[in-house]
Amino acid sequence: MNDIYYAIASYHRPKCKTYHALKECGIEDERIVISLNDSNDFKTYVEALGSQAQIITRRGNNVASNRNNILNYFENGAKIILLDDDIRDFRKWEEKQGNKCGAQKKITELDKTFNEVFSFMQKNNIHFMGCLPTTNNMNIASYVKKGETYSFNTLVQGGLCFVIKSAEIKFDEKWDMLEDYELNLRMIRQGYIIARVNNIVPNKSLMGKEKGGMYDRYQRGEQQLWLRRLVKKYPDMVTKKDRTVLLKRKWRI
């Protein structure tokens, strides 16, 4: 099972930027799956993307149910890239010679780049990985300069995740937001290794700035509610700070 599958969770965004970003990189429709949270959107998506696009539906309440729909679509052991629907392109940090600053470079060979991550996962018995939640050059450079390509047992957002399908990876559908962080913390507590790749990032819309997706929830300020619930469920692991949560300590691997 060597193929990588690209799976997009989408809601009310028929233009689906991520689909077009994948096609620009030469990814075949046979390896792209778009899962709709609202089955009523099916016709609109087909009209926007064409009949060749693989579109699956399941009426669900939130992105957690949509991502589970994707996971249930594949067999155990499948290599899956879980994606948001608002990604313009994918980037990798490249260091420069001498004193020149490094820079983000657009990835064109996605399979080659992402296979390196999956190889790392297989060697280290890791089934779930993510990337940095920011495209800020200073943040990325700080990890690369330390030689820290990968971080372990930390929080990763769900916009670009690497999954080797297994039973323990299941989003809690009671969580309307922060379902990615909840899964991270639950797996760490259960003794699984979560990892983050620090030199690959998705170039995507700012959270809560583009209609569709999670836009309405962000506009209603629901994120603060779910941050508090996350801290309440995992008080020994995270603490709330402004609009996010921080790990209280480094968890062993």
What are these model-predicted stretches?
Residues 2-5, 24-34, 51-54, 78:
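Short loop->beta transition adjacent to catalytic acidic/histidine clusters or analogous donor-positioning motifs
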Residues 4-5, 10-14, 175-253:
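C-terminal catalytic/acceptor-binding lobe
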Residues 5-27, 40-47:
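Short, well-formed alpha-helical segments that are part of the catalytic scaffolds
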Residues 11-15, 40, 87-90, 136-138:
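Short acidic, S/G/P-rich loop/turn micro-motifs used as interaction or catalytic elements
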Residues 17-20, 43-46, 91-94, 139-149, ...:
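A short acidic (Asp/Glu
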Residues 35-83, 88-102:
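Active-site-proximal specificity loops/subdomain of glycosyltransferases
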Residues 79-84, 127-132, 194-197, 239-241:
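A structural signal for short, well-ordered beta-strand segments and their strand-loop junctions
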Residues 90-182:
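Conserved catalytic core of nucleotide-sugar-dependent glycosyltransferases
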